[in-house]
Amino acid sequence: MVAVPTSTASLQALPQYVVADIDLADFGRKELSIAETEMPGLIALRIKYGSEKPLKGARIAGSLHMTIQTGVLIETLVALGADVRWASCNIFSTQDHAAAAIAASGVPVFATKGETLDEYWAYTHRILEWGDGGTPNMILDDGGDATGLVMLGSKAESDSSVLDNPGNEEETALFASIRTKLAEDSSFYSRIKSSIQGVTEETTTGVARLYQMQKSGELPFPAINVNDSVTKSKFDNLYGCRESLVDGIKRATDVMVAGKVALVMGYGDVGKGSAQSLRGLGATVMIAEIDPICALQAAMEGYRVVRLDEVVQDVDIFVTSTGNFQVIRHEHLIRMKDEAIVCNIGHFDNEIDVASLKDYPWENIKPQVDHITLPSGNKIILLAEGRLVNLGCATGHPSFVMSNSFTNQVLAQIELFSKGDQYADQVYVLPKHLDEMVARLHLEKIGARLTELTKQQADYISVPVEGPYKPDHYRY
């Protein structure tokens, strides 16, 4: 592994990548080639915009899981003219052969599977540091860590007390990394912040952070909420999780899902896909929800809607998918049955109170699979240390569904980079006609043929023949 730099001055002297093993590049390239055949949206954008180079001049700081599918995204951005630097947004989600292949192509990549928290924040800093002393002008984010780093760092420039009281292990590493950077360059973050033309955000949790900044008047640049494009949230979040959740659980444990009792906490799009996946393999699935509408949806689908504290001792497989924190707390963990499997498919690692288990005996079974002995003598199986199980214990969503999400990301980057002056410092979603375009680009691959409206039919329902076909408020 290449050493992490300790000062900005050393950047140009170091190789512009940090990967586990650059010799994995050939393996990664073979898988990239296969993934491209399953990602028609991204390939269509290369064909449509490749000669125009609409991202020429864009310097994109990318913080998103460094997987094979992300490699196809990165190479699409480059094909459209962008300069790109990349880090993963999760310490366990990198596929090392994917990182090696992209690094070998000349794109600066800073990502390894199983990073420490110190390494994670060092690598996130590296995507903000161009070797020529320049700065990024765009951020492509997943979970909001890159955006949040810039914002918190700029606050710390004028008031270092914001770094005084870290609330957990992750904040301890984050705050230390900011202090180190400020000691080298006291205006680093504000300089980055002023150079950013726009941010595109991939996931629910990161979008929530953006809306919080907008509400408080602190958002300093326009942002596009990619997550709430229909072709992202109703496909990636639902159908992606429907396949990748059980993939992660079974790779980690080899457990028979049929006959088990599973509890999915949260019944949004991610929870819906997760519940379907477990039911599809024969589990008895229950749902925990705070939202009466989501709870009613779950009940109408035939799931029992329950409270965690009333069923915790009966559950074999726990899955958190809420985007909240302290969902499974210490009081729940210590009551779990012997060999209960505990995992999370929400973005951050604080849905499960893993920190409260640190003083109990841990036995590592294999990477991202730990046996923890409770005071009762029961053992639980914790997957990916409470981080994303589908990426920590498997390889994430399939290429086809990620093509939907990443096609939205590319369109959002083009929109903000080329038309950023037309946007206020607010959070936007992509217009409906682009959402429909993303869907169209994926139909032929799966043999779907659209029916076409006649002009008379279109006039009858007051829509254009070519769409969009639904109003913005329509719920799919």
From Swiss-Prot:
InterPro entries: Adenosylhomocyst_ase-like_sf, Adenosylhomocysteinase-like, Ado_hCys_hydrolase_NAD-bd, NAD(P)-bd_dom_sf, S-Ado-L-homoCys_hydrolase_CS
Textual note on the cofactor: Binds 1 NAD(+) per subunit.
Listed GO biological process terms: L-homocysteine biosynthetic process; one-carbon metabolic process; S-adenosylmethionine cycle
Class of this enzyme: hydrolase
This protein's UniProt keywords: Cytoplasm, Hydrolase, NAD, One-carbon metabolism
Obligatory cofactor(s): NAD(+)
EC number in record: 3.13.2.1
Top-level taxon of the source organism: Bacteria
Similarity comment: Belongs to the adenosylhomocysteinase family.
PANTHER family in the cross-refs: ADENOSYLHOMOCYSTEINASE (PTHR23420:SF0)
Official protein name in the record: Adenosylhomocysteinase
Organism annotation: Prochlorococcus marinus (strain MIT 9313)
Gene designation: ahcY
